Amino acid sequence: HNGLTYEETLEQLKQHYDGYHFSINSEDIFNPYSIINALDDKEFNSYWFTSGTPTFLIELMQQKNLDMMDLNDIWARAKRFDVPTETITDPVPVLFQSGYLTIKGYDKQLGMYYLSFPNQEVRQGFSESLCQYYTPSEVGELDAIVYAYKKNVLINDDMGAFMPHLKA
């Protein structure tokens, strides 16, 4: 028992593990692996990232100078995703195909999809994984950056306030 009501538990499960969309009209899809683990542990943890973030994806993002802040607000045409996997140079289709980004909206007039993180688990886990590649390697410094991330981004929803910590 975690001290939450049934309704509060459902809301927390939704915030942490819901939100995947594979097409514009799809229903919200929960991450089943994370749901099973959260119910078993009776805690809201980041289970999806236990396998780690693929190195090739991080390298692709670094090559294209894709900023973490950009991942909260991506507009893309469908054509952007119609590229053979072996010749892909754009990290956005890879992020979508691997579940780091999901469809949040569609502008029919412009013919563009709005992509963002599907839920809190992915947003937090991916950002913390990226910190390892964009920050000093000292454990204490990394912990300070993770703290700044959680305080500024997760609690206050202010990515701009967090960014100076990465450049320090």
Regions found by a protein language model. Give the residues of each.
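Extended alpha-helical interface modules used as scaffolds for assembling large macromolecular complexes
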Residues: D28-A168
